[in-house]
Amino acid sequence: MIPMLESCEIDFFEMPSDTLGAVGTIEKATALAREKKKPVAVLARHGIFTSAKEVPPPELEVNQSSPMTRRAALEAILDLVGDSDFVVSTTGYTSRELYAIQQERREKGSGRPVGGELYMVGSMGHALSIAQGVALAQPERRVWCIDGDGALLMHMGSLAATAGLGMRNLVHVLLNNSCHESVGGQRTAAPEDPKTPKGSYFSQLALTAGYSHVYSAGNHDELQKLNFITTENDQGSTFLEITTRVDPATNKNLPRPNETMTQFKDAACTFLRSFTAQ
C-alpha cells in the first residue's frame, strides 16, 4: 500500500496504537488535506483496533410486500436457462446466491456446465455491459444478464446502449427489491409511486430506452405465465423485471466462492470458446 501511495504522490500517515495518538494523527491528516486540497491517507495496521461490541443490524428500509424471494426468482430463471446459454450476474448477494444454487444443483447432477456463468463480484453496475459484449460477439448464443436495481442505477447509461443495439439473443433480468441489500439495505434512489404497480419505474425506463420486449412479474405465477423468450423471428432485446422481497435469514447462510475471480474468468472464457451455442 505504501509504495502505491508514494507512486500516486498521496501524502499519508500511519496511525499509532494509542487513542490520543490516533486522534492527533487524524487531525493532522485532515489539516493537511484542507491545506493542500488533496486526498490524504491514514493507514491502520492489522490488529490495531480492539474488537467492537456486537450491535444488532439496522432494520431494512424496504417493505416486504412482494411474495417472491431472490432465491425463488433465481431458481425460476435458471430453469429457463439452456446449457449453451451464458449468464452474467451482478455483484453482491445475487451472485453469491446464484453460485450457491449452481453448486447445489451440480452436486445433484443437474447443474449447468462449469463456466456458464460469470459473477461480477465487486463490479457494481457492469454486468449489463459485459453481457452486452458477449451477446454481440456470439449472436447465436442466448445471453442472460441478472441485474439488480441498485446496480442498474449505478451505470444506467448501459440500459440505453444495450437497447439501441437491438440484440434478440440478450435477456436482461432485473431483480428489484428497492434497496442496496448487500451493503446495508439502504433504499435505492428509484421513486415509488403508490398509484402505480411497484417496479413500474424500471419497466418504464426500459421502454423509454428502447427495449423491444418489456415484462414484469411480482410472483411465481406471473413469472410462469410470461412468454418472454424470443425466437428467431423476434427482433430487439428483452427486459424482464421481477419484484422481490428481502430475506435477511437467507443472506446469513450464503456461501462465498472458493474459486478466485481469475478462475471464474478463465472458466467462462473456456466455456465461450468451446461450448457451441444451440
Question: Where are the model-predicted features located?
Answer:
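Thiamine diphosphate
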Residues: 6, 75, 100-274
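Short, structured patches in soluble enzyme cores that scaffold and shape functional sites
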Residues: 16-17, 44-46, 174, 242-244
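A short acidic, often aromatic-flanked loop/helix-cap motif at beta-alpha or helix-coil junctions
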Residues: 18-24, 48-50, 95, 126, ...
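Internal gly/pro-rich beta-alpha loop/helix module
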Residues: 1-38, 43-44, 55-60, 225-231
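Active-site glycine- and acidic-residue-rich loops that bind
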Residues: 16-26, 68, 150-155, 219-221
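Phosphate/diphosphate-binding glycine-rich loops and adjacent basic-rich segments that engage nucleotide
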Residues: 25-79, 83, 245, 249-278
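Residue-level detector of anion-binding/catalytic polar loops
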Residues: 11, 39, 86, 212-213
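Active-site diphosphate/adenylate-binding microenvironment
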Residues: 56-127
